[in-house]
Design a protein with these regions (language model features):
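Alpha-helical segment proximal to the catalytic Tyr-Lys
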Residues: 129, 171-175
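Conserved glycine-rich cofactor-binding loop
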Residues: 21-22
């Protein structure tokens, strides 16, 4: 909840979180809902409405793909019809396609860029007109967008591009008092990292000063704080247990 201008009446913020059927996106949506805010969750899962209902009564779901222009238009129309506006947009939807340069296909490259970079651009473009002064965009980045890891050309390039987009939009939208920031999770316990071998997992944890993986709930808390920080824009917030300091 945030305070109304008179300082007395609490006002529920209106959130939209992409990639929210599981993982970090789901945790962000659940946290916002638990604190009294209204939430729209977006995901390709056809059961997204049921997932929304399981989070809370003020949560609704839209089954959509951020890589499809028509779907993004439909998302914006749903939000406008329900709420008439939007306060916080969290661009969390992500796709990881790994492989060395000699193995990645054009389809891998294009699909990753479409989800991780073009998707957030389309979402901001479609929804920024619904955001009042004080609105907030939180883009979810990745450490690989700042440090080179072999076999991560697609993912690394897409997340590096998202950093650039964050910087440009922060400046461009500041005149409307809309803030744009990036949260960069480190090695987090999600379905994506669950497939990593024990050996690889131990090697990564060995580089993290705090010597453990992060949780989706910890990432959600940071997204919540960044979304509500009124004098922060164009910032990159690493939430990685110190990993970036030790690479």
């Amino acid at each position: 909840m945030v305070q109304a201008p008179d300082g007395f009446r609490p006002v529920a913020r209106r959130w939209l979180v992409t990639g929210a059927s599981r993982g970090i996106g789901h945790a962000v949506a659940a946290l916002a809902a638990s604190r009294g805010d209204k939430v729209c969750i977006v995901g390709r899962d056809p059961g997204i409405a049921g997932i929304a209902a399981s989070i809370g009564p003020d949560v609704f779901g839209v089954s959509a793909d951020v890589t499809k222009a028509d779907d993004v238009v439909r998302i914006a129309a749903e939000v406008e019809a329900r709420w008439g506006g939007l306060d916080v947009l969290v661009n969390n939807a992500g796709l990881h396609r790994g492989g060395g340069l000699d193995r990645i296909s054009d389809e891998d490259w294009e699909a990753t860029i479409a989800t991780n970079l073009s998707g957030p651009m389309r979402m901001v473009r479609a929804l920024v007109g619904l955001m009042p002064e004080g609105g907030s965009v939180v883009n979810v980045g990745a450490v690989v967008g700042f440090r080179g890891f072999p076999g991560d050309s697609c993912y690394g390039a897409s997340k590096a591009g998202l950093t650039g987009l964050t910087n440009v939009l922060a400046v461009e939208l500041a005149r409307r008092q809309i803030r744009v920031n990036m949260v960069v999770p480190g090695f987090v316990q999600t379905e994506m990292t669950a497939t990593i071998s024990d050996r690889a997992r131990d090697a990564i944890i060995g580089r993290i000063p705090l010597r453990r993986m992060g949780t989706v709930e910890e990432m959600a808390e940071v997204c919540w704080w960044v979304a509500g920080s009124p004098y922060m824009t164009g910032s990159v917030v690493f939430t990685d247990g110190g990993l970036m300091c030790n690479l």
